[in-house]
Amino acid sequence: MAGGSDGSENLDNQDFAQNRRAQYRHTMSNHLEQLTAEWLEYRGYFVRQSVLVGKRDTGGFAGELDIVALNPTTRHLVHIECSLDTDPWSKREARFTAKFERGRTYVPSLFAGLDLPAKVDQVALLQFGGGTRETLGGGRLIWVPDFVADMLSVLRKSRPDKAAIPSTLPLLRTLQLAAHFSQPRGRTGCIIEQPEGATIA
């Protein structure tokens, strides 16, 4: 419904813009979750993603865990929550504390019957922010740039022509190509030709 002259149109536009930003953050967060899940699978983990936990008798669930993964060889059990938020630290602390408390309650039941460690390693994976903080909500804090750098340092050791990442891990396979072929090899490789001195819009 169109807004009126009383300013409701501006409010409608603001709501629309806020919804679009929220949808964008959700989509990008899902992308980060998928990349993280692919990395863990590549490194030998059993991975569960977007896991609903705490089913209520009245319907619904207590919440959702982004990624839970277990390495059967090392017995490393990890719960990762990904976020692209730009919230103040106080709000982040409260939110991740609740997420990780939920994880400690429900993660062990996701791998019932398996030999699990006594403690769940919990990680907050954030893209935006900075400082010297190393923990959040009771879990370890890892920044996306550091996470990507770690992946690239490993992927540079496996050549695409000799040890290609499986096509079932498309995001990680793209990173492997970028790790080995990031330097331009001449204009013959340009799909879209750019005039000399031109900048990409």
Residue spans for each PLM region:
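Intrinsically disordered, low-complexity Ser/Thr/Pro/Gly-rich regulatory segments
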Residues: 6-201
